[in-house]
């Protein structure tokens, strides 16, 4: 590995999260999902005449296909910044859910809105958590397909959300017995690398939309991951991916771990909590998820010894925290005793809850209460979701200790180190001055009285004199 190569230790990244939504009263559906989703977005539509907007923090909020609220973080350039802005989306959605409940009450409809940060519903439909990483054009898609995919396929062992797989949603050989799996997303992925997102659901989407200078960058769109409730799980998921991308850019080779059949292997791994399910490699050798992850973690520790420190980006100290957690999780799984990570990793936390109910009541995984727990774990509503309740009581680990006020502030304030700052500042001034404007990831536009727009193709730049001039023109009206 060579730190002299074009390695992005400061990398632009973001997360897009689709949420499940229901409205219940006394355990029964009170409002249909389509209707409650529209009610959730009514304040947005009433104000902006659209259910697809960019927010004051520079992110994006919209109602996706299938009545799924979706939040995309603004561009972030460090691990902790991304985790804060991912949580900030929950703040925004919880505000909307509170307003929706009050609106229902005004209509004399009793109902509680639930927002699930998960990846599958009770009918077996899947919705995503998509990770976006900016990479240079110098790194070839073929190399990513061969050497990044083995990491992505096996990382469910260290950061899966956990899931009771039901017969209708399992990819099985006729066995219809429900089973606890590592990943919610694994059974819904069918290809390694593809330009599709919904039809075939690849691990890496190759549709070339960099939202930046296309001659310099590409946006790596990873759609295989589970949504994370736990901050430590999210930190491990994102942080380990950042390290692997850095190592690939630095010239490290992981071609010995190229997997022969990615779509089958990702399912096999998901059903084996020990990490020892057979993984046939392209070379003909048989490995397992545990061995592959151990190899990546060992290389990551070596990389940290030469990783350059940037003024911005994720500090080496935070990356060392990631590697320490990575090794801790793998050691626990290797030993067969996961008690040391029972407050750190989503699939372990959830499994322990389910195990306790099974031990107490003798239920098997078909019991409706256990299936309810599977979903309630992911409810982001304060005081309603299982995980957030555990977090409030200090029963699970935090990566962002003491950051609650920063998370709340981030719902309305953009990152100060990326292009999102200009977008957020522009929108704030426009809204405060009732100006007719529009934005997207790369453009700012004043619509009236004289149309004027600029393209911002450098996502690393937090300042541009042209953006300052546009803001000044609004203030000078």
Swiss-Prot record:
Signal peptide: none
Pfam family, one: Pup_ligase
Top-level taxonomic group: Bacteria
Annotated active site: 64 (proton acceptor)
Binding site for ATP: 60, 73, 441
Leading EC class: ligase
GO MF annotation terms: ATP binding; ligase activity, forming carbon-nitrogen bonds; magnesium ion binding; ubiquitin-like protein transferase activity
EC number: 6.3.1.19
Residue positions binding Mg(2+): 16, 62, 70
Keyword Nucleotidyltransferase in record: no
One GO BP: protein pupylation
Family statement: Belongs to the Pup ligase/Pup deamidase family. Pup-conjugating enzyme subfamily.
HAMAP family in the record: Pup_ligase (MF_02111)
Note: The reaction mechanism probably proceeds via the activation of Pup by phosphorylation of its C-terminal glutamate, which is then subject to nucleophilic attack by the substrate lysine, resulting in an isopeptide bond and the release of phosphate as a good leaving group.
Described purpose of this protein according to its UniProt entry: Catalyzes the covalent attachment of the prokaryotic ubiquitin-like protein modifier Pup to the proteasomal substrate proteins, thereby targeting them for proteasomal degradation. This tagging system is termed pupylation. The ligation reaction involves the side-chain carboxylate of the C-terminal glutamate of Pup and the side-chain amino group of a substrate lysine.
Protein name, UniProt field: Pup--protein ligase
Organism: Corynebacterium kroppenstedtii (strain DSM 44385 / JCM 11950 / CIP 105744 / CCUG 35717)
Organism phylogeny: Bacteria, Bacillati, Actinomycetota, Actinomycetes, Mycobacteriales
Gene behind this protein: pafA
